[in-house]
A protein has these predicted regions:
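Short, small-residue-enriched loops and turns at beta-alpha junctions
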Residues: 1-4, 81, 98
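Electropositive phosphate-/nucleotide-binding environments in soluble metabolic enzymes
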Residues: 4-7, 56-59, 106, 122, ...
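Conserved phosphate/ATP/ADP-binding segment of small-molecule kinases
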Residues: 9-88
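Short, small-residue alpha-helix embedded
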Residues: 31, 100-128
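Short, well-structured alpha-helical segments that form the helix of a local strand-helix-strand
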Residues: 61-66, 121-136, 153-154
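Short, contiguous, well-ordered secondary-structure segments
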Residues: 83-85, 89-91, 111, 115-116
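Short pre-catalytic strand/loop immediately N-terminal to key active-site residues, enriched for Gly-Thr
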Residues: 91-102
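Charged C-terminal helix
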Residues: 134-169
Length: 169
């Protein structure tokens, strides 16, 4: 993924205990799958993007890995992909502004972890990515740059109407 230390740690962790949900950008999950990846620091490389041309190949690859690892994968990017051994979903919510600030991957990871407490990994990942993407779209409309966008993203996620949440009471 982004460093040999991080990659080796992830590989070792996967031998000790496989998480129910493994989230990463395309470069990270390609690397974890033993494929060539083109990461730039912690970001996915421009060559590691989900496209119409590679969609079916990547879906097959990641479904095989999800089955091998007995987990669900959330591959983030301009278009997110959630893959389990028997299901696949694509999420197109979000905005390029989300890649211009630090921490969106961590935020999404925490949302996924929260949702895992109340549902299965596939539903948790699809719901988290969709809702976080919607919050990003709303935040972009109300911000003037990356600083205000970051604050607005938190506010928009916090203020999503209860009926927009899958897990509302």
């Amino acid at each position: 993924a982004c460093s040999s230390l991080r990659y080796e740690f992830a590989q070792k962790l996967m031998t000790i205990h496989m998480p129910q949900l493994l989230k990463g950008n395309m470069s990270e999950l390609l690397a974890m799958s033993g494929q060539t990846a083109h990461a730039i620091g912690i970001d996915a490389g421009a060559q590691d993007v989900l496209t119409d041309a590679n969609c079916s190949h990547l879906k097959k690859l990641f479904q095989e890995k999800a089955a091998q690892w007995n987990t669900t994968l959330l591959i983030t990017g301009k278009k997110d992909m959630v893959v389990s051994p028997d299901k696949c979903a694509f999420i197109t919510n979000g905005t390029p502004a989300m890649s211009q600030i630090t921490g969106t991957g961590c935020m999404l990871g925490m949302i996924c972890a929260t949702y895992l407490a109340v549902t299965d990994p596939f539903t948790a990942a699809v719901t988290a990515a969709t809702e976080f993407g919607i919050a990003g779209e709303k935040a972009e409309k109300n911000s003037s740059g990356p600083g205000s966008f970051q604050v607005e993203l938190l506010d928009q996620f916090y203020n999503l109407p209860a009926q927009d949440y899958l897990f509302s009471q």
